[in-house]
């Protein structure tokens, strides 16, 4: 049962709580935790990720939140993460990587792939002077168009 302690794995109830809050705030049914080097590097920035790449803003979200989560903390971290997931297909968890969210495992994996590309682009952007992420209006429009188009295609299947 969700929220009950698992012997030898004290973190499990906290993870269940985190997932429950995300499910409350999204229509998606798959949450995958990715702790790839790219995801961890991006999450360690500790700030929201404003997309450099168009496919990232379309698939993951125009701005992907970066939330704190401490498995020993009170419920507030999980609630914050759940709210941050609303309207997005990914959230960064500071120092822990990313949670990629989708309607099926393939969607969640696609989010992971673009998140890794975004992380690499963000690292290069720090090295190249004058590099800027996509503008706010550009990100929002791209995400909106993608969601509307993808939703219609998904409904047909």
Where are these regions (language model features)?
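Glycine-rich flexible loops
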Residues: 1-157
């Amino acid at each position: 049962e969700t929220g009950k302690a698992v012997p030898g794995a004290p973190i499990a109830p906290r993870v269940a709580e985190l997932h429950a809050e995300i499910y409350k705030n999204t229509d998606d049914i798959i949450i995958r935790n990715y702790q790839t080097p790219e995801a961890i590097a991006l999450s360690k920035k500790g700030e929201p990720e404003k997309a450099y790449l168009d496919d990232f803003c379309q698939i993951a979200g125009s701005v992907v939140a970066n939330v704190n989560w401490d498995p020993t903390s009170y419920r507030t971290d999980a609630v914050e993460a759940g709210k941050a997931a609303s309207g997005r297909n990914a959230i960064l968890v500071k120092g822990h990587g990313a949670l990629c969210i989708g309607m099926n495992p393939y969607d969640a994996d696609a989010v992971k792939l673009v998140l890794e590309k975004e992380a690499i682009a963000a690292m290069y952007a720090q090295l190249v002077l004058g590099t800027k992420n996509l503008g706010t209006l550009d990100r929002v429009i791209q995400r909106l168009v993608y969601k509307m188009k993808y939703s219609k295609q998904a409904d047909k299947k």
